[in-house]
């Protein structure tokens, strides 16, 4: 991609080998490019096509975006849902919410503690904190965020989408 004379690398998560992680590429790319456009998607799956889900690969990408200096400002996140065999509105909602949840989870991590442990070679602390984070009450924070945004935290939105699908689509 090119913008204002700057060439940048577009990272399309859906076109990498499923065993390859793109999250480990972001820190390096952010050092050399003014911004990094990121196409967050999944390779084809039988159940949901390209719809972004709240899964490890997306959480890892979001964690790197949050942890990298200026990552939140320099990474441009885009998604698509045109291949979804499910309702397109539901695909958009599921994908957007999964991406937001992943970013929120990254923001809730004790980044300074992890960076200090990494820089001092204290890999025991880094591992212990990383494992402990997995049991943090993330769901309560997500529910509070949704409440603040006046949107349902659970699947209440699905009724509205199904009504729209039946009446409009």
Predicted region positions:
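Histidine-acidic metal/acid-base catalytic patches
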Residues: 2-11, 15-169
